[in-house]
Amino acid sequence: IPEIAKERIRRAGRKIKEESQLTTQDLDTGFRVFRIDSGNYKNVTMQPNEYDQQMLDLFVDNIKADRTDLDLLFGAMLAWGVQLSLPMTTEEVDGCKIYAVDGNGLVACFAENISENVVQTMAAKQPLRVLFRDSCFDEDKTKINIFERFKQQLDWDEKEAIQNIRVV
């Protein structure tokens, strides 16, 4: 049934484009398809007697290996109550992909060891919310510095920054 529905939507989009009087405009008839899946995170909740010192490296990254940037982005959007139908753009800076949802509603980057230029580009968008993956930062002090930069540049107090900046 989902495949039939997707094909009908594609055909309807083509028909609308063919019959549209707006031939000079790029008419967007695209759509997103979602499926229900398990969460993006590994279960790392264990009792102290269930693991040993050699296993600690297994818990460095709590995100499941098969998850994509978009999985993380849409998961965060759901958690924040942000509509999944909002427009989204991507921009590449220093080899890192930056996602912007609804203009400046949510700005995210999941690349490893992001550069100062990436952070500056994200902050310049004056986002309402910011999302990073923990592996974006090579050290905790880098994470703290970026947190403080967003607070300063966006004129957020501590509480606003904690609410609006997430690291997954």
Task: Give the predicted meaning of each segment.
Residues 1-168:
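Accessory, often C-terminal, charged low-complexity segments
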